[in-house]
Amino acid sequence: MSSVVVVGTQWGDEGKGKITDFLSKQAEVVARYQGGDNAGHTIVFNDTKYKLHLIPSGIFYSDKTCVIGNGMVVNPKSLVTELAYLHERGVSTDNLRISNRAHIILPYHQLQDRLEEEAKGDAKVGTTLKGIGPAYMDKAARIGIRIADLLDKEVFAEKLKTVLELKNRMFVKMYEVDPIEFDDIFQEYYAYGQQFAKYVCDTSVVLNDSLDEEKKVLFEGAQGVLLDIDHGTYPFVTSSNAASGGVSSGAGIGPSKIHHVVGVCKAYTSRVGDGPFPTELDDEIGHTIREVGKEYGTTTGRPRRVGWFDSVVVRHSRRVSGITDLCLNSIDVLTGLETLKICTSYEYEGKHLDEYPPNFRVLEKCVPVYEELPGWTEDITGVRRFEDLPENAQRYVRRIEELTGIELLTFSVGPAREQTVILRDIYEA
């Protein structure tokens, strides 16, 4: 039996989808455990590019079970749209399983998300406005509606009426906007539920049975550890546990059943949205990295902020997620830069900081301490063995291993599947 968790070690967009797709080749079950359609990942399969937001990357393999776990928040409309998107392209979804305990996102969540973000003004956190945060808020407040409720017409109607009374009171009195009517939601969203009802089950049973049968199970994280609700750059975070600990609660398996935690990062750093970013580059080098790396959000299309590799960030992710293996993506993007920099620590008001501080006001004033390494000019997009990388590229990668304390599992020199080089079998380790 071997289970592997894939997490982002930075602020998301590290290329987890590609790595998950790569590791899916050997896995028998692929599961997501947190987040919603705010997380986009791009996968290249059979020379075709696909963009998914909810459904796990393993969906392209008909012999693998794909699970949407109970820790996710699911927009029924988005899910139906994504299923149709796959069906139109000839991709079967018969291998999909959806947790009956997952909470759903409804139109009032998206409205609440927008109104709250607008009300914050300059203090906004840069939400994707998908309704993720309000849905998790309702879950914690015990007024959320789950997929099991959505499929029961009477229960759905009863719960929807109750929640709308609360929400509309807030919308009308607090934000002075028109209320949302019951009929604007009920029939449409009940119909969505019926369209994916055949996939719904107790996914905790599916996952635990698979692990007990010694199947290879891959858990696919969304966003990144620095966006984790507890361990990220709070309050500029998502509303769920993106760290590996989210697997136990979000998939319904015990922590003793997790064997490997794979951390994915880029050879530099990127971020979408607001919040502190110590190594951010606002110069020509930053512009070059953004354009060469095509750093624009899968979900929002927003240009990503980019910066040098920050080992303080990745060490923090390693510690709070128990990361055992490292996947380093987008090394090729750095080709042609004369000098590369890696942040090894921070300076804050004369103090030396080796660990990531929790106070975002402190982070905003942190000055990165850099180590410089020589770059390379050789085209590395065709490299398929580590030893074939230019000497300076090898030195750069090995230094990242040393500074983060994580052994390299894969490295990527381009977006295509064959441009990801795996150094060992994670399932046999």
UniProtKB/Swiss-Prot annotation:
Protein source organism: Exiguobacterium sp. (strain ATCC BAA-1283 / AT1b)
Biological role: Plays an important role in the de novo pathway of purine nucleotide biosynthesis. Catalyzes the first committed step in the biosynthesis of AMP from IMP.
A Pfam cross-reference name: Adenylsucc_synt
Cofactor(s) demanded: Mg(2+)
Pathway(s) this gene product operates in, as recorded in its UniProt entry: Purine metabolism; AMP biosynthesis via de novo pathway; AMP from IMP: step 1/2
NCBIfam families: PRK01117.1 (NF002223), purA (TIGR00184)
Record protein name field: Adenylosuccinate synthetase
Domain of life: Bacteria
